Amino acid sequence: MVYENPDGVMVGLEVHVQLNNLNTKMFCGCSTQYHDSEPNTHVCPVCMGLPGALPVINKRAVESAIKIGMALNCEVVEQTQFHRKNYYYPDLPKGFQTTQYDFPIVGNGKVVIEGEDGEHVVRITRAHMEEDPGKLVHIGSIDKSKGTLIDYNRSGMALIEIVSEPDMRSPKEARRYLDKLRNILDYLDVFNGDLEGSMRVDANVSVMGGQRAEVKNISSHKGAERAILYEIMRQKNLLRRGGEVVMETRHFDEARGVTISMRTKEGEHDYRYFPEPDLVPMRVSDWAPAIREELPELPDAKRARLISEYDITEMHAKALTSDIRVADFYEVVAAAVEPRVAGTWVADVLKGELNYRDLSVDSFTTDDIIQIIKLVVEDKVTEQSAVDVIRTILDDGGTPMEVVTEKGLLKVKGDVVTEAVSETIAENEAAVQDYLGGAEKSLNFLVGQVMKKTKGRADARQARELLVAALKS
């Protein structure tokens, strides 16, 4: 099926990634570990823009930017350069932002996502380095604030801005692109995505070939999807009423789910870019071969290898590789038990229980899941009981055998199951008659009653076989 886009929706994203796994900021020696600190305590003359303070480039930040570019299939330039982007805003103490203009460090890349009609390529225009401004803390909402406080702890943090072409055609595609980008960045270990402000999105949205509006500083992937959906509907409704979409910058109000006009969109000439006189151009192409050697296995390559090496399903491989920690966890488990069985238990069962509790895979040990799987494979507990063991460990702690012993979960067999089957038949005459009359679903009910009597410790397949045999005799 070919996806049709009758409204001509075009979405391009500018994603600002804070390289917070570095020890120091982009151009000074201030610590990056400011998130739990008092405001304005991780600052110095450089990141405060005091007269006479001179910047020094963080080499590790440059290496991280090149690594990100390579992972996004970008070309690394031979020589790159910093520029001053001149504008006044309270969170920018220097009166300009040190960024890159016509010599970005990488460009011309691509990311492949699942589109509306199969695989879809999102082109990467460029990715460039810049410094983060400070943080404005509004007293009240942004549009009705009684005052604004400024925290400069964030000022000068190393950022890489990843700019896409307007290749996304729906809010869902934009969300998938962001998820894929986050996945790649996690594998590169260049940032901690759990920290506030580590990944911020500006969305450029247009419909029906009209002007684009830019929605700034969206803080989450879900928020970006909602903001883009609202903006598409706003522009379509405006055009249908005979109005005109103007090029402007808008803010997304998370609480109300709406975008609000902030200002008319500036052009590049408004920023009066010029080369940063305190920083010389850098020749970075010579660094590329060594950095490429350090690139880890990326999500798409890992997914293909897991399918080939362990013979697991593509669905399981996607679930496992969506988080590098889960993928690594799985490979340890797959070395100890049958890989396809391990795939089911890690990708479906354990990951589902972790997601339900908003926990990471670090909350469970490979030794515990291996022991639980072996209990099932060795016919000592049922699958239902094994799930109960996982839930109990996550909620209350303990080891698999402690939980099995305390809750009496060892599998029951023989006479115990036969007796439960006989009691179930005797106590559920209506369901028995329905089954004998051809209602197959009544058998499922009877199996459930046997499982209930044995507290989930009987083998459901065996219970079904015994029921069928008894009812046909």
UniProtKB/Swiss-Prot annotation:
Question: What catalytic reaction does the record list?
Answer: L-glutamyl-tRNA(Gln) + L-glutamine + ATP + H2O = L-glutaminyl-tRNA(Gln) + L-glutamate + ADP + phosphate + H(+); L-aspartyl-tRNA(Asn) + L-glutamine + ATP + H2O = L-asparaginyl-tRNA(Asn) + L-glutamate + ADP + phosphate + 2 H(+)
Q: PANTHER family, from UniProt?
A: GLUTAMYL-TRNA GLN AMIDOTRANSFERASE SUBUNIT B MITOCHONDRIAL AND PROKARYOTIC PET112-RELATED, GLUTAMYL-TRNA(GLN) AMIDOTRANSFERASE SUBUNIT B, MITOCHONDRIAL
HAMAP family xref list: GatB (MF_00121)
- State what protein this is by name: Aspartyl/glutamyl-tRNA(Asn/Gln) amidotransferase subunit B
Q: Cite the entry's keywords alphabetically.
A: ATP-binding, Ligase, Nucleotide-binding, Protein biosynthesis
Which residue windows are transmembrane per the record? none
Highest taxon above the source species: Archaea
Protein source organism: Methanococcoides burtonii (strain DSM 6242 / NBRC 107633 / OCM 468 / ACE-M)
Q: Which Gene3D superfamilies match?
A: 1.10.10.410, GatB domain, N-terminal subdomain (1.10.150.380)
What does the subunit comment say?
A: Heterotrimer of A, B and C subunits.
NCBIfam families (alphabetical): gatB (TIGR00133), PRK05477.1-2 (NF004012), PRK05477.1-4 (NF004014)
